[in-house]
Amino acid sequence: LSFIFPLFWRNYIYLSLIKPYVAQKGAVRANLGLKFEILSVIKVLLAKIGVIFKKGLKMWSRDSWRKFNILQQPSYPDEALLKKAEDKLKTMPPLVFAGEARNLKQDLAKVCSGEAFLLQGGDCAESFSNFNAVNIRDMFKVMLQMAIVLTFAGRCPVVKVGRVAGQFAKPRSSDYEEQGGVKLPSYRGDIINGFEFNAEARVPDPNRMIEAYYQSASTMNLLRAFSRGGLADLHEVNRWNLGFIKKPELDAKYGELARQLSQTLAFMGACGINASNTPALSETKVYTSHEALLLPYEEALTREDSLTGDWYDCSAHMLWIGERTRGVNDAHVHFLSGVHNPLGVKIGPNATSQDVIALANVLNPQNEAGRLNVIIRMGADKIGERLPKILREVKREGLNIVYSIDPMHGNTIKAANGYKTREFDKILAEVQSFFEIHRAEGTHAGGVHLEMTGQDVTECTGGSFKLNEDDLAHRYETQCDPRLNADQSLELAFLIAEFLKKI
């Protein structure tokens, strides 16, 4: 029976049969000196056999998730309308191509080995109402500004992945929200229902998936144009950074690094290295990602690659599973186990090393470098206690994992004036702990995952401009969780640059 259930059988055979047997044969094993070799070979063989059986028995299909326990899904009142929307999405062109997802996996493999750094960031949740070219451009600019600082400090490439062109659906802690004695379904993101607090807006509407698709396609078009149309020129990006540090609050802290970068670019120009003969100076790659939460949407955009026969979720280059939906036997993990995109999974303070190992065995059975990104989100007060053991035990298993830190979700608080916010110092503290713990454990601190915007919002307190709780009301624009504004995001990049120098 274990061969019929691919989510369980490989671990069952290894833990129940192989490992105890090898343990009992200690004397023979010691004489041959093959303890670790035998175990590692067996595990690799079992992983490969698992993939063969999984494909051979066709246990996965793009709609097989529907047979599994599923969380955080809306209840659509009109099933016929839902089916119509799904069928329409299945006929639409892919938003990304399989080859691009493979390129990202190769880039993330370098992150896994410590040869590159992952910068992943963007809106908590994209919205239909705030969609415009200026907002996308400003987000793109801040990502580039952060990346050039991190590249220069870390002396390694930065893999840029936006939470963009699909980051619409949001998990909620409660199915309902109450205001002034009125109880309505919770807002789950513009792809599902409306933000306005009225009964009509809060009804899940499957046609919103179609609108989300078109907005994502427009966003992808802009990102591709920005990446190759001159906006990514390193000299321009550096000029933006020089403008940033002209503010007196910042020059003393970060001016030296920015000026060193200017001198380096000037030296390269003097040597004849410029945008006209070196495209890398004026072009860049920005990949897209989002939480694969709304599975009807993800299924509809999952396509079989004509070159390899593998399945890819073509709604984004990279997908991740949230902390609330990462059950190893649940629908979200099952669905993403069958697509070949790079994957992420959020890991909170209550997770154990066995949780991470079990997820890796299901989501990355061939142990490919660059396939799996574990996104730590524990909070500044808990990461020091919880993360070291996970790193230690996962390292012992020999698993190829990209570790990144999400310092946002574990540090969310409610201000005295009722606004949900995050303190810059707490965000920085968790990032710093993440780097220090990895250095102590001999593992790679692979990247950061941030909720941020290119706009001058006032949603997170602190930073060099010392935003306080009274400032939150000035430009509190998020429809979900608080984001770092442009200045706070770039300041955080300069501070992370100091951590990278020590690696």
Question: Over which residues does each language-model region extend?
Answer:
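Cationic, amphipathic, low-complexity segments that mediate targeting or membrane/lipid association
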Residues: 2, 23-36, 40-43
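Short hydrophobic targeting helices and cationic amphipathic motifs
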Residues: 5-15, 32, 39
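Compositionally biased, low-complexity peptide segments typical
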Residues: 17-20
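N-terminal basic/disordered segments at the start of proteins
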Residues: 56, 60-115
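Active-site-facing alpha/beta catalytic cores
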Residues: 125-126, 130-379, 422, 430, ...
